[in-house]
Structure formats: structure tokens, C-alpha cells
Amino acid sequence: MNVLSLFDGMSCTQLALKSIGVRPNKYYAAEWDKYASSITQKNFPDTIPLGDVTDWFHWDVDWSTIDLIVAGFPCQSWSMAGARLGDRDARGQLFWVTLDIIQHVLEANPNAKFLMENVKMKAAFEQYITHHTQEALGVVNKHLINSALVSAQNRQRYYWTNIEGIEQPKDKGVVLKDILENGVTDREKAHCIDANYFKGGNLKSYFEKHRRQLVFSPNGLCHVGDADLNGNQSIKRVLDVKDMTWRKLTPLECERLQTVPDGYTEGVSNTQRYKMLGNGFTVDVIAHILSNLEQVK
């Protein structure tokens, strides 16, 4: 199998393929971030780097040999957490570059499979992307999958693909305490980590805005069971400010949230590790989707 990965990052797609027993004959990676690319080369030295996706028409690629193309196109323009400018933003324009490349591959090899990924977004954006993807590429199956089914992180993502037979992953029952190096947490699933996680967070934004997962020392947080008027069990958060300490998730813990092997991103600064992990795929979700490829069955 020959694979073309757009916006490859630290090559979560190769990790996913490896986990389902697929070793590509050729793996082309389009990525401009030098730190993410260095992690890819450290772990997968046979990767063929292509550089920036906007230079795709200069690439030395035999398009007819590409069997799979994967693209997690930039989310900042489409995300509910961003400016929501869609393709009016320069990064949003990369959606059209993505479609152009996939269309070019399918013209050269109609049997090629594709997988596109982006954040859960407002309905109008999702419908816009789905419509234009269908217009450009033909039959498209759309799936909304939460990484919480395979990891300890709430991370809802849309996937558009021509791979058939995809169902929701089975819930592995992984909770946040399972992946911590130390400390305790007040919830079962982490907030979605993003590329800005390295900036840290504070208690106010964590509890009021549900942002940037924090971990507490054992004597810093206690749970008090409570029941609402409907009899549903809920949790009150009680903080002992005097004795409380809190911290960010470690890079290792973020690797585990993304179902990346421990230590995979070692070799760059923690800032860069957080950034690439926040930008990356949840590996086990991609592995679940790609396990439906005919070459794998």
C-alpha cells in the first residue's frame, strides 16, 4: 500500500497503520512543521517528506500508485472555539487544496481511498464541507466519532471517507485516572487537548469554562456525592485552597490521551510536544477506521 498523508504532523496515520499490521510500501508526508517532522523521521525514517501542501503540483509522486490519502486539514477556521471564518480565512482555504489533491489522486487511481478529518463544528460549516466534498469526490460517508470511546479524552471529530463499513468504535472504558502519572482528577474524561495546551490554564477557566484539563494533588480535591431533583447522581467539587496543588497534564499523559505510544514525541521541547499532540489524531480512532480497508480485512 502506498499512502499520501496531508498535514501529516507527527505521523499519527503511520502509528494507526502499524497498529493494524500495515506497513506501507511508500509513505509520503506533507508537513511544514519542522518539529513534528523530526518526530516522524525519528520514529519512521523511511517516510518520504514532501513539504507544504500548497506546493503539491511540484511533488515527485506517481499519483496512480497512491492507494490511500489521509488529511486532517486545519481546524482553526471551522472550530467552535475559533473565529469561525470558514474558508474566508487563509487556513480555511486549505480545505480546497485538500479537495484538489484528493480529486487528482482519484482521477489517477479511481480505486484509491481517502479519509478527511476535522473538528465538530457548527451545522452550517459541516453541511458546507460535506456538500462540496461530495461534489468534488463523489460518494462520501460522514461519521462523527468521540475519542472518549477509545481513550480518556472527550474529542469529537468529523470524518469524511469513501471507506465502507465503518461503525462506532466499542467503548474501551478508559478513564482519566487510568492514564495519570500521579495525582487525582475530578472527572472521568479529559477536556479535549489542543495545540495551545502548553500555555497552561487556571482554576477559574477550568471550572467555569471547562478548558485545559488540570490534575490535582490527592489532598487538594475531594468529591461529595449529591443527587439532583430527578434523582440523578452528580458531583460537587470541593476545593481545600490551603492545601491544594494543581498542574497541567504531562506530555506523557497527553500521549496517552491521544493513544500514542509512551515517549513517542520525546526529542523536542515540551511546548512542541504539547502542540503536535494537540494537533494530532487520536491514533486508535484512525486505526479503527482504517481497519475497514479491503487491504486489511
Where do the PLM segments sit?
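Class I S-adenosyl-L-methionine
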Residues: 56-68, 75-239, 243-247
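Acidic-aromatic/histidine active-site loop/patch
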Residues: 286
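Redox-cofactor binding/interface segments in oxidoreductases and associated redox assembly factors
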Residues: 51, 70-71
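FAD-binding beta-loop-beta segment adjacent to the flavin cofactor pocket
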Residues: 238-267
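Conserved Rossmann-like nucleotide-cofactor binding loop
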Residues: 35, 198, 282
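Short pre-catalytic strand/loop immediately N-terminal to key active-site residues, enriched for Gly-Thr
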Residues: 269-275
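SAM cofactor-binding core of SAM-dependent methyltransferases
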Residues: 4-55
